[in-house]
C-alpha cells in the first residue's frame, strides 16, 4: 500500500497529488494533497501507531504537536504544519513549550511501549530508579553491538551511575529525539514538535540531545531552571544518542562517544 492508498482507505478521501519530502533517514514521509485542496502528511514507519500515541501525549500537555488524523499498521497520517523559520528563531518560545512538556510527569521512568530508531530498539520498560533505567535501557543495551574495549568502558560507567545521576529526578515527559530538525517554527514560535521518541525521565536528557546538534543561546539554557550540576551530567545523557548514531551510521561517531566518556572519567 502506498501513501495515497493508505490515506484514501483510512480517511475515505481521494488524494490528488503525492510528493515525497526530504530527510527521513529512518522512515519515508510524504505530503499529500486531497481532492478538496487540503494538505496532510503521511509517514511510513514500523512504529507508526506508537508514534501517534506520543504525538497525542505531547499535544495533551499544551506543547504543540501535529494533529493525528489516523494511524494504522505502518502509516501515520497527520496535519501538515506550515513553517517559515528554524529553531534559532524560536528559542524563547521553545523554552516555554519545554516547560509545558516536562511538567507532565509520571510515577516511574519509561514508557508503556517499546520504540525504535530503525534497527535500533529503544527499550522503555519502566523502572523505579533513574540510574538503573539509564544503565539498563540506555547504555548496557548497546554492549552486544560495541567493540570489547568500548563495551567494558560503558559497563564501568553504568556500574557507577549512582555517583553521577540523581536517584529520583522528576519523571518528566521527554520528547526523546529533540534536535532542531524536529522543531517546526512559524512566526518565530514553535509550530510543532515532531518525530518524537517519548518516555518519562530526567528533563536534562532533552537538553543534552538539543545541545548535541544545535547551539542554544545562554539565555535559553538559563531560562529552563535546570538543577545544579547539570552540565556535568550532559556527557552521560549524550551517550545515548551518540551510541545510537554509532550503530546506525558507523565509526564517524566513534570520536564523539570517546569524548563523552572521557568527560566523565571513563
Language model features by range: what are they?
Residues 163-172:
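Conserved short strand/loop->alpha-helix "switch" segment adjacent to the catalytic nucleotide/phosphoryl-transfer site
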Residues 126-132, 171-173, 180, 184-235, ...:
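Active-site Asp-x-Gly
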